[in-house]
Design a protein with these regions (language model features):
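Alpha-helix C-terminal capping/helix-to-coil transition sites in glycosyltransferase folds
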Residues: 4, 77, 83, 195-196
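Short, basic/aromatic recognition patches
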Residues: 14-34
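Short loop/turn motifs at secondary-structure junctions and domain boundaries
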Residues: 31-35, 44-45, 156-158
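Short beta-strand scaffold segments in enzyme catalytic cores
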Residues: 38-47, 164-166
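Single conserved hydrophobic/aromatic residue that forms the stacking wall/gate
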Residues: 1-9
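Zn2+-dependent cytidine deaminase-like catalytic core
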Residues: 43-142
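Residue-level signal for inorganic ion chemistry
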Residues: 22, 40, 87, 127, ...
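Active-site ligand-binding patch in enzyme domains
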Residues: 106, 152-153, 158, 162-207
């Protein structure tokens, strides 16, 4: 591999690593951000992480705002890695694009466009018009998996439902000896899914 190609490969690998961290940050806050999607953000300068941010509890502030607020260094010409397209409109918070432009961030990577029509695809143009390099689609499949429930809810106007059923190998739900057939591993998964959900529906007997 030539030096030029090697440098390109190294940059691409670093970009993926930074975005993986952003995705991990988003996943850690998933289910705790109200109606807003959980977003992760990493800011890098000279190949060094200088700040991170997540969507706040109940959805505010946004991850980009938190990452900028958390940073004590000059953000000029830094790179921002964010899991979802930054917002570009005024709502309960100012546009993240405005904050990015104001702080002279030089390059923005995001995994995928937001499904919200107020945002979708518009941030790309806004940032480019302000001389900020923009690249989208980095680790898009991972982001699609992370935002499956959010996109389903916005597109279908329906709740995203996860069903959990425990059965034994012989397809019996429980025996007279013991009603519990799950182990500690499956119990941990169940509690994790409950943590990431907005509501839980159970039978009266479960209580």
């Amino acid at each position: 591999m030539s030096r030029g190609l090697g440098d390109v490969y190294k940059r691409q690998t670093q970009d993926k690593d930074f975005m993986k961290l952003a995705l991990n940050l988003a996943n850690a806050r998933r289910g705790l951000t109200g109606n807003n999607p959980s977003v992760g953000c990493v800011i890098v300068k000279n190949n060094r992480i200088i700040s991170i941010g997540q969507t706040g509890y109940n959805g505010r502030p946004h991850a980009e705002h938190n990452a900028i607020l958390n940073c004590s260094e000059n953000l000029k010409d830094s790179k921002m890695y964010v899991t979802l397209e930054p917002c570009n409109h005024y709502g309960k918070t100012p546009p993240c694009t405005k904050n990015i432009i104001k702080n002279k961030i030089g390059e923005v990577y995001y995994s995928m466009d937001d499904i919200d029509l107020k945002v979708k695809g518009k941030s790309y143009s806004i940032l480019r018009e302000n001389n900020i390099r923009v690249k989208k689609g980095l680790l898009k499949k991972d982001a699609e998996n992370l935002y499956r429930s959010y996109f389903f809810n916005r597109k279908k106007k329906l709740p995203y439902v996860i069903g959990k059923i425990a059965v034994s190998k012989n397809m019996i739900i429980y025996s007279e000896i013991s009603k519990r057939i799950t182990d500690k591993t499956s119990d941990k998964l169940t509690h994790y899914l409950r943590l990431k959900s907005d509501g839980i529906m159970i039978s009266g007997k479960t209580l």
